[in-house]
Amino acid sequence: RALEYACEAAKICNEPVPEIWEEVGKNIRILRFKDGITREHATYNGEMIKQADVNLLGYPLYFVGDAESQKKDMEYYVDKIDPQNGPAMSYSVFCVQYARMGDAKRAYEMFCRCYQPNLRAPFGVLAETPTSDNPYFMTGAGGLLQAVINGFCGLQITDGGVEQLSSVLPAHWKKVTVKGVGPEKKMYVRER
């Protein structure tokens, strides 16, 4: 979507849009296996991967837009992520998607996986991977925030502003409150 946004920005600024940007943006291919699961790359055949690249096509990019395809992709790739060297952000992406699909149990499981193995003493900062001692990993921390704000609370940034989409909370959570959003400092609440 970066090319799409670049084209939109150029138009807003009354700048010419290079034809190649639009051409490439319209012709990006999403590869799939015969069963419809999105393929990591052209020669991918099920081996271990570092992170959830394919699943970023479902959230936050929305190239894979329907929930059924997103779920199939998540179920396929969740056990393909390297458990020792995969970054925390993969599971936060899964958390957002499951929370928005209404699967509170699976969303919470992914939420825990997105930070618990990566916590480092003495301050509880997040390392990049479960085996890394290199804190502070800001992408992982950002993913953790997205899991709560965009996943459990359901907030989505759109061209029209911030919207609250349907989502669910874990069974033992009562509510999530996100305050001070946008220039109007709005408050959003998701209750069980």
Report each predicted region and the residues it spans:
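Conserved active-site neighborhood of enzyme catalytic/cofactor-binding cores
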Residues: R1
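Active-site core of glycosidic bond-cleaving carbohydrate-active enzymes
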Residues: E4, E8, I12-A141
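Non-catalytic C-terminal accessory modules of carbohydrate-active enzymes
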Residues: K105-R192
